[in-house]
Swiss-Prot record:
Belongs to the long (4 C-C) scorpion toxin superfamily. Sodium channel inhibitor family. Alpha subfamily. Residues 1-19 form the signal peptide. It comes from the Eukaryota. Pfam families: Toxin_3. Expressed by the venom gland. GO terms for cellular component: extracellular region. The keyword DNA repair does not apply. The keyword Cell wall biogenesis/degradation does not apply. This is Toxin To9. Residues 21-81 form the LCN-type CS-alpha/beta domain.
Length: 85
């Protein structure tokens, strides 16, 4: 089997698949969602954002999501800037 056939088959198998990522979902201003140790709140919030699941990460007391769509915004390295888009 030559390489071009192998590449074509691999491309067809991955076409239309959406990758997923994990992270802290954010609202305006790159601000994550505080959770106060409420896992149910975070799980609901994450699922509303099309994630597989979520929980309240006790170290930062912020919601953390598993399986967010690749297009979903997650917390970067910058500071929270409330009121900024």
């Amino acid at each position: 089997m030559n390489y071009s056939t192998l590449i074509a088959v691999a491309s067809l198998l991955t076409a239309g698949t959406e990758s997923k990522k994990d992270g802290y979902p954010v609202k305006e201003g790159d601000c994550a969602f505080p959770c106060g140790y409420d896992n149910e709140y975070c799980d609901k919030l994450c699922k509303e954002r099309k994630a597989d699941s979520g929980y309240c990460y006790w170290g930062n007391i912020l919601c953390y999501c598993y399986g967010l769509p690749d297009k979903a915004a997650i917390k970067g390295y910058g500071r929270c800037r409330p009121g900024k888009k």
